[in-house]
Amino acid sequence: MAASPKINRREHILQCLATMLETNPGQRITTAKLAAEVGVSEAALYRHFPSKARMFEGLIDFIEESLLSRINLIMDEEKDTMKRCQHLLQLLLIFAERNPGISRLLNGDALLGEHDRLRSRIGQIFSKIETHLKQILREKTLREGKGFNLDEAILANLLLAVAEGRISQFVRSEFKQKPTTHFEEQWVFIQQQLLQS
């Protein structure tokens, strides 16, 4: 008889937390509810994480690692400015769509009433993404000698706001309004506007 695979309890706790964020939109997650979902005592949770904030930080680490590593691939593999921007935004939207519970963290909805440093960490992730967008837009100016009519920082902020708005709609609709719906058509319009500037 084969031995059952050993469960990484820490990962299992984070998976349960993400699932609870998805299945309980708008509700606060308590350690008691999480322990019940995981099937352990609250004390057992605290053997793996010293606090609930550290559990959320575990998910935020996953978000940051997943997004930024893929953004770096986009930066390495794609050289066209508009395609880079499109792929970066699509990555963010697809990631949110595939991870509805985690999209509540990106949106900040699940962090209301939690430690301030958690909201700061999410803010830092979005700042890094915006910095990548600025870099992409500035490189176009350097490569082609022709920039945009608006400052690249303003354009990068606008592009990120589009993605953040789509994620916000996704959370507000309780995951019914997918962030990628109509993005292709919207991107065609956005790209036309950017290239006219």
From Swiss-Prot:
Coiled-coil region(s): none
Keyword ATP-binding: no
Localization in the cell: Cytoplasm, Nucleoid
Database matches in Pfam families: SlmA-like_C, TetR_N
Record carries keyword Transit peptide: no
GO BP terms, alphabetized: cell division; negative regulation of division septum assembly
Keyword annotations: Cell cycle, Cell division, Cytoplasm, DNA-binding
Signal peptide: none
Main localization category: cytoplasm
HTH tetR-type domain residues: 7-67
DNA-binding region per Swiss-Prot/TrEMBL record: 30-49
GO molecular function: sequence-specific DNA binding
GO cellular component: bacterial nucleoid; cytoplasm
Task performed by this protein: Required for nucleoid occlusion (NO) phenomenon, which prevents Z-ring formation and cell division over the nucleoid. Acts as a DNA-associated cell division inhibitor that binds simultaneously chromosomal DNA and FtsZ, and disrupts the assembly of FtsZ polymers. SlmA-DNA-binding sequences (SBS) are dispersed on non-Ter regions of the chromosome, preventing FtsZ polymerization at these regions.
Family: Belongs to the nucleoid occlusion factor SlmA family.
Complexes and interactors: Homodimer. Interacts with FtsZ.
Protein name (Swiss-Prot/TrEMBL): Nucleoid occlusion factor SlmA
Protein's organism: Shewanella woodyi (strain ATCC 51908 / MS32)
